[in-house]
Curated annotation (Swiss-Prot):
One of its GO terms (molecular function) is structural constituent of ribosome. Gene3D superfamilies: Ribosomal protein L11, C-terminal domain, Ribosomal protein L11/L12, N-terminal domain. Forms part of the ribosomal stalk which helps the ribosome interact with GTP-bound translation factors. Part of the ribosomal stalk of the 50S ribosomal subunit. Interacts with L10 and the large rRNA to form the base of the stalk. L10 forms an elongated spine to which L12 dimers bind in a sequential fashion forming a multimeric L10(L12)X complex. GO terms for cellular component: cytosolic large ribosomal subunit. This is Large ribosomal subunit protein uL11.
């Protein structure tokens, strides 16, 4: 018989840096899940990734206090900031530019994020990433 799902917990955790402090500890603790077990499993799964890269993770909590987790690709904003070599986007997008990214860089990011994007093909995915760049105050150039 399948386990009864108690709920889902969505977190963004730096790769290789999961520890029981907030926000992970309280989120898992209120569901009665083993915090250290998640931290060890997550850190082992993200060991080969770039340390500190934010990884969205969805934890499925079951009624018997067990869990599973699924990792997604890092946010587009992380890749865009890295490509534009900036630390943050513009405070006034549309008015002040924070940097520039090329369409080729947007295409590269779209290829990496294709599994998590709601797009049918690479061209649509590239447009989604370019839109994210513009909303961050980055200029998209050819």
């Amino acid at each position: 018989m399948a386990k009864k799902i108690e709920g889902y917990i969505k977190l963004q955790v730096p790769a290789g840096a999961a520890n029981p402090s907030p926000p992970i500890g309280p989120a898992l603790g209120q569901r009665g899940l083993n915090i250290m077990e998640f931290c060890k499993a997550f850190n082992a799964a993200t060991q080969k990734m770039e340390q500190g890269m934010p990884i969205p993770v969805v934890i499925t909590a079951f009624s018997d206090r067990s869990f599973t987790f699924a990792m997604k690709t890092p946010p587009a904003s992380y890749f865009l900031k890295k490509a534009a070599k900036v630390t943050s986007g513009s405070k006034t997008p549309g008015r002040a530019s924070a940097g520039t990214v090329t369409v080729a860089q947007c295409r590269e990011i779209a290829e990496a994020k294709m599994a998590d994007l709601n797009a049918n093909d690479l061209d649509q995915a590239t447009k989604i990433i370019a839109g994210s760049a513009r909303s961050m105050g980055l200029q998209v150039v050819e």
